[in-house]
Swiss-Prot record:
Domain of life: Bacteria
Name of the protein in its database record: S-ribosylhomocysteine lyase
Residues annotated for Fe cation binding in this entry: 54, 58, 128
Subunit and interaction comment: Homodimer.
GO molecular function, one term: iron ion binding
Lineage, highest ranks first: Bacteria, Pseudomonadati, Pseudomonadota, Gammaproteobacteria, Alteromonadales
Protein family: Belongs to the LuxS family.
Amino acid sequence: MPLLDSFTVDHTRMNAPAVRVAKSMSTPKGDTITVFDLRFCVPNKQILSERGIHTLEHLFAGFMRDHLNGDNVEIIDISPMGCRTGFYMSLIGAPSESIVADAWLAAMQDVLAVVEQSEIPELNEYQCGTYEMHSLEQAKEIARSIISAGINVNRNDELTLSDEILNGL
């Protein structure tokens, strides 16, 4: 099985909250697609709550589009990581980490402004596979912790696992 890019970085040295360019590629027509690692929690030390990350998934996707989409950027997808330490965001364009971090902070402020659970988009059995597994309060706790901590940048050149380590795993 091929080694995926996300498993070539040292998770023991990742900072959180932090933005990292996980991958960048060009389409056959020359458009740039960038995948960002939006790391909310320090891997293997913290984890996002099940209900909190699910609610955040519904809110974050729209709020990030509000703050980041524009003439040169269009978000394709924002999805939670299976390890529940963050989200991957795929987009057309190549915004800087600082622009992404600013949009992320603004999106967290938007989460705090949601008053009632009924305001969560697609919160119904037709549009959500586990529509009863949500917590606006837990999503707000996550947002508050991100705002309080601020967002750093994780750089691949500082996190890349050596061939020696990879071959020994």
